[in-house]
A protein has these predicted regions:
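N-terminal entry/capping and adjacent linker segments that precede and initiate structured domains
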Residues: 1-384
Length: 384
């Protein structure tokens, strides 16, 4: 009746069931809308336990790059008629801006030159991030990069693994490049702590590819082994992988397991995917093979003598980068499912090495930034 409080289905359900089983499955923006409906929903969805549980229930989706910013795959499944779509995360302030980034738990660190930012696109919180000073090297060309972002479980802090490096140039090209320095920063701190790389590596620095997060550690494929950074002890170690695959493999994040893929033929027309079957025993098993020559794509594939970049959408579906800047949607049997399309009709799509799993997770730096009257505006806008 008019003026009376309308009954809803949710009114008949226990409060804990609504919060833990219904609200915990919604996207962040919908949880925020529900917070405005009832005070009990607001308090129930504000606990750290809910925030972590909510994050674990969100799909982990590949990140797509284009000239105007950063997007993500729209969902973990797509109908054959509509195809796989992408939706924007961040939009650059102007055309021509290109930022490097790394992700963890719905947080992104983005940087360009010496400007670093940490943000949560789902909550639209952002703050400048301090970085370690450049180290003193023989070479005049030095730099600082982010290798990884992770949650340090014992303290609950989010920490950044940095690398400070030197690069040879000109007359210094004949000089052997000095070993990089690896440092750990707590987000919001300006006190770095140097950590030791396990051995002198001939395979270079892991900055070329972002790490795969798995079982609380960061993983890079380097040479004939996998380099692991244990985020609790904050130490490096080596993990074995199938030696018969050669010296160049690429890691693949399946969402619930660690995998790698490689092309063992000279023309790079077949891709073999291996999955880590037992993490502690470091045993791997062959999972499936994709034959690019047999893929009936439209337009036809342009086969290059290089390994294409892959990203997992779900147990059966993949994204594949096709030069120059085309994205394919296929399954693990090598069946072409369509071309990836943008809701805003962006072209020149590039598949990143990263995944995004939205969250309501915050860091103290966000609150400190809100209290600071002086704001360092980032060169992007969060649009998720």
């Amino acid at each position: 009746m008019p003026g009376s409080r309308a009954a809803t289905v949710l009114d008949d359900l226990p409060e804990w069931l609504v919060v833990d089983e219904i609200l915990a499955r919604l996207p962040v923006k919908d949880v925020f809308r529900c917070r405005a409906v009832r005070r009990s929903w607001r308090s129930g969805t504000s606990t750290y336990a809910f925030i972590l549980g909510h994050h674990r229930r969100q799909p982990s989706l590949p990140i797509i790059l284009h000239d105007h910013g950063i997007s993500r795959v729209a969902g973990a499944s797509a109908s054959a008629s509509s195809g796989q779509k992408i939706r924007p995360l961040l939009r650059y302030a102007s055309l021509g801006i290109c930022m490097r980034f790394i992700t963890c738990d719905g947080l992104l660190i983005l940087w360009r030159g010496s400007d670093f930012y940490i943000c949560n696109p789902a909550t639209r919180k952002c703050a400048p991030l301090s970085h370690p000073p450049r180290q003193q090297f023989i070479s005049p060309i030095t730099g600082v990069d982010v290798l990884g972002l992770y949650r340090h479980q014992p303290s609950g802090e989010y920490r950044v693994l940095w690398v400070s490096y030197a690069a040879p140039m000109g007359t210094f090209a004949a000089v052997k490049v000095e070993q990089p320095h690896y440092l750990v920063f707590t987000v919001g701190s300006d006190q770095p702590r140097r950590i030791q790389w396990p051995t002198v590596s001939e395979d270079g620095c892991p900055a070329a590819h972002p790490p795969i997060h798995h079982r609380g550690s960061l993983h890079w494929a380097m040479g004939c082994s996998i380099t692991v950074f244990e985020t609790i002890a904050e130490t490096f170690r080596q993990m074995s992988r199938p030696a018969q695959l050669g010296s160049y493999v690429l890691l693949l994040d399946t969402g619930d397991n660690l995998a790698l893929y490689v092309s063992t033929d000279h023309d790079r027309v077949t891709l073999d995917v291996w999955v880590l079957q037992d993490y502690d025993a470091e045993t791997w098993g062959f999972r499936y093979r994709i034959n690019l020559l047999a893929m009936d794509a439209s337009p036809p594939l342009k086969l290059w003598k290089s390994i294409p970049r892959l990203a997992v959408i779900n147990e059966r579906e993949l994204l594949m980068a096709q030069p120059p800047r085309r994205l394919l949607h296929c399954d693990i049997d090598g069946v072409f499912l369509g071309n990836v399309e943008s809701e805003e009709h962006e072209n020149r799509l590039t598949l990143s090495w990263h995944r995004f799993q939205e969250s309501m997770i915050s860091v103290p730096l966000f609150e400190a930034q809100e209290e600071d009257a002086v704001s360092n505006e980032p060169p992007f806008v969060m649009v998720l």
